[in-house]
Amino acid sequence: MKKKAQIRKKMKLALKTFDFSDRQKQTQAIIDQFLISDIYQQAQAIAIFMPMSFEFDVTRLLNDTSKRIVIPKTLPQRKMIFTDYDEDALFLTPFGVRESKSDFAVIPDLIIVPGLAWTEDGYRVGYGGGYYDRYLADFTGQTASFVYDFQILPTIERNKFDIPVRHIFKV
């Protein structure tokens, strides 16, 4: 079983070098799958991460006017809240991630959880900050991830804080 640091390094490289045409095809197929899913249909407030250039492109969902779209905002002590998405009220963090200037917390019905690798049963390797696992420890709503075919691994090293994602959307 590979260590999480090795997986992070390998997957970041794989994402950065992923063929553009294949990326677009898989992204389209996965988003289409998600949009017809029950968890999407039933959710009113959906938390969507703000993708970095090599991450899964969820920006198509940011303009969904049929749902309340919220985005993560990091806080001290590796905590996180979700705030309403407003394109005109974003700033760039020192980590290169766009976040809202607002501090008004919204609890979503569904969280789209980012990551670098997953198992079939929803365990994931994130970026190592633990923000999502801390938030998900007390979260009772639905969780989902969008995963390219090469990001599924047979096993991933786990610790007691790891929270599996409930729904994996992949091609």
Model-derived features: positions:
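Surface-exposed, charge/polar-rich loops and edge strands
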Residues: 2, 106-110, 120-123, 134-171
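Short, glycine/serine-rich, charged loops/turns that create anion-binding
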Residues: 53, 76, 117, 148-151
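N-terminal active-site beta-alpha-beta segment that forms phosphate/nucleotide-binding
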Residues: 1-101, 106
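Alpha-helical elements of the RecA-like P-loop NTPase motor core of helicases
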Residues: 59, 133-134
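Anionic-ligand binding patches
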Residues: 81, 113, 119
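Short beta-strand segments
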Residues: 49-51, 113-114, 145-147
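Charged helix-capping and loop-helix junction motifs
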Residues: 63, 126-131
